[in-house]
Design a protein with these regions (language model features):
Chain B
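Short, membrane-interfacial amphipathic segments enriched in basic
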Residues: 2-46, 223-228
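Active-site cofactor/substrate anionic-group-binding motifs, chiefly glycine-
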Residues: 51-107
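Selective transmembrane-helix segments that form parts of the transport pathway or gating/packing helices
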Residues: 56, 60, 64, 103, ...
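Hydrophobic positions within alpha-helical transmembrane segments of bacterial inner-membrane proteins
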Residues: 68, 72, 110, 114-115, ...
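Membrane-interfacial helix-loop-helix connectors in multipass membrane proteins
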Residues: 77-100, 165-210, 214, 218-240, ...
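Hydrophobic alpha-helical transmembrane segments of multi-pass membrane transport proteins
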Residues: 91-134, 219
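Short cytoplasmic-facing helical segments at TM-TM junctions of multi-pass membrane proteins
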Residues: 124-149, 231-234
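Final/C-terminal transmembrane alpha-helix of multipass membrane proteins
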Residues: 234, 240-257
Length: 249, 263
């Protein structure tokens, strides 16, 4: 469903992606792991068309993302949970969740959009009481849940999760991991997650790809990850300071 | 002699010039894109109403107070200056022309630059830093249509009204000072003011307001969208937006004054 071939991206003289090749099948949950600054977020943003790759081809459902005719329809396939939530501060929680349903091609009547928002909030474990609060009034964990509710509000085919557990305590991280897994299975959505939290990887993924040096260093089913012989992968999953990955970056 | 001694300063000058021209080009492209998005759907009416409130209505107190004190001070200055050649009687006329043609629009423009440009730039820059702009795009919403167009349109429409109100309050400030402490007759002061002002004075004032409103809100949006990372990026964007808006407003004021009143 999502294909990346030989994707390159540089910012000024800094080369971030140096030929990324990746395939994600429909309904698959892929987790991209890798150290900070290895280009995980850039990869996701290239698929969404937020950043244009310098070279290479990215296809979603066989359609080149740089040549989508109807951008609105293309983006309607996606839901995204941002690292910091990226909730809109100036509008209440329910309008954040129902943002896509209040405007554009998926516009619904306001009362219906609110009902859907409350249902999605309930799905991520939040009570309807939070619907009228502003995002700044919520804790970090609740903001992540609202972000998750917004990502699934329009029942997207593809969901991206950018560091879904960063900044959360271990229990809340576990709750978010379980929610992501349940929701992805329940919706039958294709999921791409980027993280360096190995607990998330084991909880969320069907397949794992490790990004290092601007390329996919290793990829395979999560069940084969621990037995993978790649020294970079082993150093990453064991969190060892000794190994081929430079610790000073 | 080392040829670098001559070429190095030229290279520095060249780089600075190219950088400035590139910046100007980006700003012009941004302004043209804003105008294009203003006339093509979709339009976000709720955001526009909210911008009308923030840019227009909530700026009334600062505009009113600025105009009132300026009008009063202007009356005192003209009276004491005019006394040097026995021309104290021209206070109503000079206050009127000074407020309507120059001080009203310029001071309102600068106050809007301080209040609105800064807040728009800080808000949009923070949205950029916290990935809210990226989130807008993933939610099929064009950031220029959702953030820039409502604010710039609100600036274009409400700042002329603010200038009109500022002109009236400024004249009132001058009237109050003149009648309470300078011994002018209230009715004849007002009569002189109304008789002296011509339609072109008011028209130029409102036209300046529209241009200054466009500049002030556009600069806030432009620098907000161009913001760098982190708190430093937001601070730099806010500072640059206010400086650019103030300078452009003063430059535009000169050009508009020349266009309206050059003989």
């Amino acid at each position: 469903m999502i294909e990346l071939s030989n994707v390159h991206k540089s910012f000024g003289s800094k080369q971030i992606l140096r030929g990324v090749d990746l395939n994600v099948a429909r309904g698959e949950s892929l987790v991209i792991i890798g150290g900070s600054g290895t280009g995980k977020s850039v990869t996701l943003k290239c698929v969404l068309g937020l950043i244009m790759p310098d070279q290479g081809v990215i296809k979603v459902d066989g359609e080149d993302v740089t040549q989508t005719g109807d951008r609105d329809a293309f983006l309607a396939k996606f839901g995204m949970l941002f690292q910091g939530g990226a909730l809109f501060d100036s509008i209440p929680v329910w309008q954040n969740v129902a943002f896509r349903l209040l405007r554009g091609t998926l516009k619904r009547p306001r009362s219906e959009a609110r009902e859907i928002a409350i249902e999605k909030l309930r799905r991520v474990g939040l009570s309807p009481d939070v619907a009228d609060q502003l995002p700044a009034e919520l804790s970090g964990g609740m903001q992540k849940r609202v972000g998750l509710a917004r990502a699934i509000a329009a029942d997207p085919e593809i969901i991206f999760f950018d560091e879904p557990t960063t900044g959360l305590d271990p229990i809340m991280a576990g709750v978010i991991n379980d929610l992501i897994r349940e929701i992805v299975v329940e919706m039958g959505a294709t999921a791409m997650t980027i993280t360096h939290d190995m607990t998330s990887v084991r909880a969320i993924s069907d397949t794992v790809a490790m990004l290092h040096g601007g390329k996919i260093r290793w990829s395979g089913p999560v069940t084969e990850m621990d037995s993978g012989e790649d020294p970079y992968l082993q150093q990453f999953i064991t969190g060892s300071a000794d190994g081929p990955i430079e610790t000073l970056r | 002699m080392n040829p670098g001694v001559i070429t190095r300063p030229l290279a520095v000058l060249g780089r600075a010039s190219l950088g400035a021209l590139a910046g100007l080009g980006r700003l012009v492209i941004f302004a043209l894109a804003t105008v294009r998005h203003m006339v093509t759907p979709p339009f976000y009416s709720r955001e526009f109403m909210s911008a009308l409130l923030n840019v227009g209505y909530l700026s009334l107190p600062v505009v009113g107070l600025t105009a009132f004190f300026t009008g009063g001070a202007l009356a005192l200055q003209i009276y004491s200056g005019g006394a040097r050649f026995s021309a104290e009687a021209v206070v109503p006329q000079i206050v009127a022309i000074g407020m309507v043609r120059e001080l009203g629009p310029v001071l309102v423009g600068l106050m809007i630059a301080a209040r609105v440009t800064a807040s728009v730039a800080a808000e949009i820059a923070t949205m950029k830093v916290t990935e809210q702009i990226d989130a807008l795009v993933t939610l099929s919403t064009h950031p220029m249509k959702y953030l820039t167009v409502p604010r710039v349109l609100a600036g274009l429409l409400t700042v002329p009204l603010l200038v009109g109100i500022g002109d009236i309050i400024g004249i009132y400030g001058g009237w109050l000072v003149s009648t309470q402490s300078l011994g002018f007759n209230p009715a004849s002061y007002m009569q002189n003011t109304v008789n002296f002002l011509q339609p072109i004075d008011v028209l130029s004032s409102l036209a300046k307001g529209a241009v200054f409103g466009f500049i002030a809100t556009l600069m806030g949006c432009y620098y907000g969208m161009q913001s760098g990372r982190g708190a430093q990026g937001v601070g730099a964007a806010t500072k640059s937006s206010v400086v650019a808006a103030a300078i452009l407003i003063l430059a535009a004021n000169f050009l508009l004054t020349q266009a309206f009143f050059s003989i």
